[in-house]
Amino acid sequence: MLVPSDMIAAQSKMVYQMNKYCADRVQVRKAQIHKQIQEVCRIVQDVLKEVEVQEPRFISSLNDYNGRFQGLEVISPTEFEIIIYLNQMGVLNFVDDGTLPGCAVLKLSDGRKRSMSLWVEFITASGYLSARKIRSRFQTLVAQACDKCAYRDIVKMIADTTEVKLRIRERIIVQITPAFKCAGLWPRSASHWPLPGIPWPHPNIVAEVKTEGFNMLSKECIALQGKNSAMEGDAWVLSFTDAENRLLQGASRRRCLSILKTLRDRHLDLPGNPVTSYHLKTLLLYECEKHPREMEWEENCIADRINGIFLQLISCLQCRRCPHYFLPNMDLFKGKSPGALENAAKQVWRLTRIMLTNVRCLEEL
């Protein structure tokens, strides 16, 4: 098929604009975040070292692997989450019956005594390992460690939350989340994935992702708030971060995500935080299903993919629903105010209109 020369010229201009935007904006953002990460991890490692002295069951898993820290997630340039992996889930069964959207529980295996578990005092009378009880104990230990550590003048615990959150130099927020890694397991609530008839991802990658498994996090679950569920405090939040990152390898998918995050930080950091980098990552995964071929993710297609993701974001904001990629019954907009979502839809449309109508738009964005 012959492609009109003016279309090729427009594509070439957009590729040039994208490359320039990556050099001028995306790389600067990455460099700033990298600098923050070095300080954040140095301070948190010191705090966790103190925690481990008080309670050897909470062993720090925050280690540097060739410049990347295991368990570190960048929420925004000033907000980070660090996952601390706990040991010995052994005598506990993973229970995922769908009654707790986005969550599951860990229950003592039939016939096993509480005393066989490393976490004996956090197991409820019904035999569930309570995520809230573990987090409460961890929060107390971290608070004590902050008072003793070498960085006590610049790191403070954030009060009025059941989460373990630190404020560093009054401007950086770090959440430290206890978790269990569930390798070789795949939750029943995500068993529909991948959808039949969709060629992406490749079956080999699907097998790899399911073997890698998922994480169970001890954190507040917005999906359960207001349900008065007796299980709410005991439930663990399902996290698929490693699976998501594996799926986004190859072609220009990661680059596309970096551009989306940069545009979000510069233009969609709005009151009420209606649009997060995780929303964009989720919609990017859906876009990968719509455009399964590798050639659709080459650099001359990135602008089209970004516009497609923003149009999908507008639709989600207007419908006030953004389904989780692996757990579509879970709404990622739950807890966001209708006013914040409506305002965000207008802002995203303004941004998308600029990108659709001005080939040199990235010079100004």
UniProtKB/Swiss-Prot annotation:
It holds the Pfam family Mab-21_C. It comes from the Eukaryota. One of its GO terms (cellular component) is cytoplasm. One of its GO terms (biological process) is eye development. InterPro entries: Mab-21-like_nuc_Trfase, Mab-21_HhH/H2TH-like, MAB21L/cGLR. Belongs to the mab-21 family. PANTHER family: CELL FATE DETERMINING PROTEIN MAB21-RELATED, PROTEIN MAB-21-RELATED. This is Protein mab-21.
